[in-house]
A protein has these predicted regions:
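All-alpha prenyltransferase/terpene-synthase fold signal
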Residues: 1-198
């Protein structure tokens, strides 16, 4: 809903198919289903698992807020970006893995190691997603250039901004807003800068 995405992982989004009201209610219903499942956790594990779940949910919200804030921020560092994607993407995977490990009887040390692995895997996933947005194949279900047109601060954009001279940085900031250019021309112009600054 927040990014008006018509497609998610190659399928029509709930938002695009049924509108924002159904999408919001669907999200609420999924959260309630999650808590229903959590209520079935053995009593001795419930505090740890519920704490892990709630922390994960709050961190995902925090990461999403950073992502939206970054769209209007003039300069975002790679460190800030990596923190944002850890919160927005990695902690969901890490929380899920950690809860599974707890339910499976894993030691604290093993839970910690699995969490760290999942964090790194989530970072790799998001960085790959950034690359696919600009250089992927739209037959795989991700429209090419969506992040560019939305003004998203991706790893590619942040790196290009850090390597570019001021005139090129200004062009990167404003190309997506140029009404004289088609979306395809805007995407091509930004990708040309990415390629040049590689």
């Amino acid at each position: 809903i927040m990014d008006n995405a018509a497609v998610r992982r190659g399928k029509p989004s709930v938002y695009a198919k049924w509108g924002p009201s159904v999408a919001i209610l669907s999200g609420d219903a999924m959260m309630i289903c999650a808590y229903r499942l959590l209520s079935e956790v053995p009593a001795e594990l419930l505090p740890r698992i519920l704490g892990t779940f709630n922390t994960m949910a709050l961190e995902v919200c925090e990461g999403q807020q950073y992502d939206m804030d970054f769209e209007s921020k003039r300069k975002v560092s790679v460190v800030e970006y990596m923190h944002m994607i850890e919160l927005k993407t990695s902690v969901l995977l890490a929380g899920s893995v950690t809860i599974g490990a707890m339910l499976g009887g894993a030691s604290e040390e093993d839970c910690r190691k699995l969490r760290r692995f999942a964090i790194e895997l989530g970072l790799a996933f998001q960085l790959q997603d950034d690359l696919l947005d600009s250089y992927g194949d739209d037959r795989l279900g991700k429209a090419i250039g969506g992040d560019i047109l939305e003004g998203k601060q991706t790893y590619l954009m942040i790196t290009a901004m850090s390597r570019a001279d001021e005139a090129t940085r200004e062009a990167l900031r404003t190309t997506r807003l140029d009404a004289r250019l088609s979306d395809a021309e805007k995407i091509a112009a930004v990708k040309a800068v990415y390629d040049r600054l590689e």
